[in-house]
């Protein structure tokens, strides 16, 4: 019989908020008796935007802005029904995007 696994992928712009949410998920899963692998840091995606500083002239004068998207991966191995219930009731921060695959 194959073992069950829940894969949770977290994304956020703030790395501290992301690590805090990952810690809450790990703590909840371990408390309910499941094994946890992670959080595994995935590569940070950096989107850069270059704009002209002046609205009219000076093409050489530019400014760059960037958005960093931090990602973490968690694997919950052999989850129990109690683990699933606890994860569904877990209230995470609004700035963290959670994707769950089973």
From Swiss-Prot:
In terms of Pfam families, this protein maps to: Ribosomal_S10
| Example GO molecular function | structural constituent of ribosome
Top-level taxon of the source organism? Bacteria
In terms of NCBIfam families, this protein maps to: PRK00596.1, rpsJ_bact
Q: What HAMAP family does the database record attribute to this sequence?
A: Ribosomal_uS10 (MF_00508)
Q: How does it assemble?
A: Part of the 30S ribosomal subunit.
**Name this polypeptide is given:** Small ribosomal subunit protein uS10
């Amino acid at each position: 019989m194959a073992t069950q696994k829940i894969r949770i992928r977290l994304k956020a712009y703030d790395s501290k908020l992301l690590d805090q949410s990952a810690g809450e998920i790990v703590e909840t899963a371990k408390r309910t008796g499941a094994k946890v692998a992670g959080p595994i840091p995935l590569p940070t995606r950096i989107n850069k935007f270059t704009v002209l500083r002046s609205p009219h002239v000076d093409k050489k004068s530019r400014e760059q802005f960037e958005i960093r998207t931090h990602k973490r991966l968690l694997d919950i191995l052999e989850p129990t029904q109690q683990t699933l219930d606890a994860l569904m009731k877990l209230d995470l921060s609004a700035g963290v995007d959670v994707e769950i695959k089973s």
